[in-house]
Design a protein with these regions (language model features):
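Binding-site signature for planar aromatic cofactors or substrates
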Residues: 2-225
């Protein structure tokens, strides 16, 4: 079989992408093998998941002009960008976000997915802020006229909106954005909550805000690689 495939490839009858994958002698195919590669997450990391949108987290969301939306459906898994002036992701209450859907390429991959599987993830980013907010929940699509009118941008209403019921959220540290230098040269927005403030508010009793903020920068630098 291998000889026949090699011959067909030489003759141009099949391309590299058509070849079946070769076994990887270094591949990881079990949870035990995977976990043996990495340190055990700290108690802080394990316990940092919150279940509601508190006032401090709402300030972070209000400062964001850009989010990534993750969905999945019968056609696969998709991740799509969503952007508008800061504040376009609306916090309705402790469990609810509204995300307007503006004009795009009309593939509507994410919306098709949500009709099949309402689970969604958001990665919420603030230019100049190293931390990101990860949000998980369930979404529904609405064309409520009152909501569309409330989310007008440049004189145009969104075609539809996502109403997202939040089930969990937590902060992601700044390492990835620092390594990428994505915000290099851009100042942190004035008044943006600190990592300590966000985590202390999301999971009361987990950390003391000032103490965490005093050690956080050095902890990030010393564990960057």
């Amino acid at each position: 079989m291998a000889k026949a495939l090699a011959t067909a490839q030489r003759r141009g009858q099949i391309g590299d992408m058509d070849m079946p994958p070769s076994p990887d002698p270094f591949g990881i195919d079990s949870l035990d093998a995977l976990e043996s590669l990495y340190d055990t997450p700290s108690e802080l990391v394990r316990g940092k998941v919150g279940g509601r949108i508190d006032a401090v987290t709402a300030r972070f969301i209000a400062a964001s002009p850009f989010v990534l939306l993750g969905t999945q459906g019968q056609r696969g898994i998709h991740i799509t960008p969503r952007g508008d002036p800061a504040g376009f992701v609306a916090v309705v209450d402790e469990q609810t976000l509204i995300l307007p859907d503006r004009r795009g390429n009309n593939r509507i991959d994410a919306l098709r997915d949500i009709l099949e599987d309402d689970r969604v993830s958001l990665l919420i980013m603030v230019p100049g802020g190293g931390e990101t907010l990860r949000v998980h929940g369930h979404a529904r699509i609405t064309t409520d006229p009152a909501l569309r009118a409330r989310h007008v941008a440049q004189g145009r209403e969104p075609t539809s909106l996502l109403v997202i019921r939040v089930t969990s959220l937590f902060m992601q540290c700044a390492k990835a954005l620092m390594r990428s230098k994505l915000w290099d040269g851009r100042a942190r927005p004035e008044g943006l909550p600190s990592m300590g403030q966000l985590m202390a508010s999301q999971v009361p009793g987990l950390v003391e805000s000032a103490s965490m903020d005093s050690t956080y920068p050095e902890r990030i630098r010393s564990t960057m690689y």
